[in-house]
């Protein structure tokens, strides 16, 4: 049994956009709409978590001498 590859941010966003389009059409049966909504919420959380992770990575930047220093937008 192969382990499922974790979805990338871009893949999750594409699926989320597809779900939103289906729900916006308005002709989705209630049960399907609920399932789409639940899947959309999972994808939304996945995207949020990935963005949070990247944000934490960007809090520090590497100086030329290799030292990690807190990132300050004013210095950029």
UniProtKB/Swiss-Prot annotation:
Where does the record say this protein resides? Cytoplasm
Which coarse location class describes where this protein primarily resides?
A: cytoplasm
Membrane-spanning residues? none
GO biological process terms, semicolon-separated: DNA catabolic process
Q: Give the Enzyme Commission number.
A: 3.1.11.6
The UniProt keywords, alphabetically, are: Cytoplasm, Exonuclease, Hydrolase, Nuclease
- List the catalytic activities from the record: Exonucleolytic cleavage in either 5'- to 3'- or 3'- to 5'-direction to yield nucleoside 5'-phosphates
CC per GO annotation: cytosol; exodeoxyribonuclease VII complex
Q: Name one GO molecular function term.
A: exodeoxyribonuclease VII activity
The free-text function statement in the UniProt record for this protein reads: Bidirectionally degrades single-stranded DNA into large acid-insoluble oligonucleotides, which are then degraded further into small acid-soluble oligonucleotides.
What is the similarity comment for this entry? Belongs to the XseB family.
Tell me, how does this one assemble?
A: Heterooligomer composed of large and small subunits.
Q: What is this protein called in UniProt?
A: Exodeoxyribonuclease 7 small subunit
The organism encoding this protein is: Geobacillus thermodenitrificans (strain NG80-2)
